[in-house]
Amino acid sequence: HGLHWNTQVFDVSSGDIRHIGIREEFGIVIAHELLDDIPATIVEYDEFLTPRIVLVDPESGHEKMGEPLSGPELDWLKIWWPATVPLARREIGTTRDHTWIQLVNIFGTGRAIAIDYSHSLDQRSQGLWDAGTLAGYQHGRSVRPVPNGKVNITAHVSLDSCASAAATSRSDLTRTQEFDSDPTRSDFRWLVQDFGSRP
């Protein structure tokens, strides 16, 4: 189990991409179902529509409402996943935005592609995802998302927010495109962003 690199077939380097000196080269970054595994703060609106951080016991999975959300995460929430009704849940996207910014800045010129479970601002504003998207998987089966280190915990990604964050990070953005990867479902999407111009 885990991540393994096959370096016998292709001439590639393995290791931490941040320490490989290719910043000025043209390249392509593909994040396939990566961002949905990045940890995110979970909040739930109380009866006054105040978003409160959901605290979880890592062994039992028991949840309780914590302190109100604040700072950059609250700013993100107001823009990208506004309040609808009490008890609605949200996964805050700031950590995914930050990860995507790091990925699009690996190369000086190139293309960054994210392929992931996602939702749009229009869908979120309509309340279509008010139950949240937090899910847990173990040995290929859906299980309760208990953060005990044994369960793979995922949540859908706000790819539109990631795209906006990357555009703010790099002034040489030349193209952004989002589209469904499967016409039969609207929650598995591609984000493609091009930066700079290839010589």
Residue ranges of model-derived segments:
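SAM cofactor-binding core of SAM-dependent methyltransferases
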Residues: 1-25, 195
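Short, well-ordered coil/turn elements that cap or connect secondary structure elements
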Residues: 2-4, 24, 35, 107, ...
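Short His-Asn-centered micro-motif
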Residues: 10, 31-32, 115
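Short, glycine/acidic-enriched loop or turn micro-motifs at the edges of active sites
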Residues: 14, 35, 117-119
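Conserved protein kinase catalytic core
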Residues: 17, 22, 38-39, 122
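Conserved acidic residues
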Residues: 26-27, 110
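A mobile, often basic/glycine-rich helix-loop segment
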Residues: 28-77, 128-136
